[in-house]
Amino acid sequence: MDFVSRPTTETAKALLGVKVIYEDEFQTYSGYIVETEAYLGFTDRAAHGFGGKQTPKVTSLYKRGGTIYGHVMHTHLLVNFVTQNEGVPEGVLIRAIEPLDGIEMMKHNRNKSGYELTNGPGKWTKAFNIPRAIDGATLNDCRLSIDTKHRKYPRDIVESARIGIPNKGDWTNKPLRYTVKGNPFVSHIRKSDCLNPDETWK
């Protein structure tokens, strides 16, 4: 997948339905991306690269598109795929996954089952047993990879405001969150809006 030559918002939409795979010593985990958020760097008041801020924790965000930027929030590991050329701190947060392979071990890792397994940015990374050390690695050159050939395509994509971003002016409500409409693994989805997962793909 091209992470560099198109707008980050387009990449965030294009990632919906892409298969994510993580392999540890014992297990292969996989699933389809159902929710993403775009973070637009220098001018995005909610982005870790806003204003060109550089600290050791955000070093990976300034690397070339296709780098994994992993950061911890409230003890949860959040995984972003960096976009754009080196030096431009933009990326896509992978917020939720519809699980495919390794579900029994995901239940063990999360001590949960059903939609709760992977319906949030810290939930799916724990389900997949992804370590913090993934930060800075290159997608598909490490244990975390994406498969754009064996993927799904959303029937409909919903654009909405990103989750948990108060007090950022215009950026609080910009529609930079992208979800597969009706997919029950999307975070914060109302039960009345949920469809059978299979009905949410073409």
Swiss-Prot record:
CDD domains reported for this sequence? AAG
Q: Which GO terms describe its molecular function?
A: alkylbase DNA N-glycosylase activity; DNA binding
GO terms in the biological process aspect are:
base-excision repair
Q: What is its EC number?
A: 3.2.2.-
Look up the domain of life of the source.
Answer: Bacteria
Q: Which keywords are on file for this protein?
A: DNA damage, DNA repair, Hydrolase
- Quote the InterPro entries the UniProt record gives: Formyl_transferase-like_C_sf, MPG, MPG_sf
Q: Which HAMAP family match?
A: 3MGH
- Give the protein family: Belongs to the DNA glycosylase MPG family.
Q: Indicate what this protein is called per its UniProt record.
A: Putative 3-methyladenine DNA glycosylase
Task: Give the species.
Answer: Staphylococcus haemolyticus (strain JCSC1435)
